[in-house]
Amino acid sequence: MARLFKVTACVPSQTRIRTQRELQNTYFTKLVPFENWFREQQRIMKMGGKIVKVELATGKQGTNTGLL
């Protein structure tokens, strides 16, 4: 069992709809290994996103986080 963080974040993604720009937020939840947490955090912040929730989780990467 690896030490993982269950991260829920919100990242703005820009989509073009008939010349006007609409801002659309994308929410996602993923398991991030303990060692890669800082890099993941930087990536989300750089994209202008917001980290909503962080929980400690145990398990394997690649499993559906909706089932945890």
Swiss-Prot record:
Location relative to the cell: Cellular thylakoid membrane
Record InterPro entries: Allophyco_linker, Allophyco_linker_chain, CpcD-like_dom
GO cellular component: phycobilisome; plasma membrane-derived thylakoid membrane
GO terms (BP aspect): photosynthesis
Membrane topology: Peripheral membrane protein
CpcD-like domain boundaries: 2-57
Keywords: Antenna complex, Membrane, Photosynthesis, Phycobilisome, Thylakoid
Function of the molecule: Rod linker protein, associated with allophycocyanin. Linker polypeptides determine the state of aggregation and the location of the disk-shaped phycobiliprotein units within the phycobilisome and modulate their spectroscopic properties in order to mediate a directed and optimal energy transfer.
UniProt record similarity statement: Belongs to the phycobilisome linker protein family.
Protein name in the entry: Phycobilisome 7.8 kDa linker polypeptide, allophycocyanin-associated, core
Organism per entry: Microchaete diplosiphon
Species lineage: Bacteria, Bacillati, Cyanobacteriota, Cyanophyceae, Nostocales
Gene name of the encoded protein: apcC
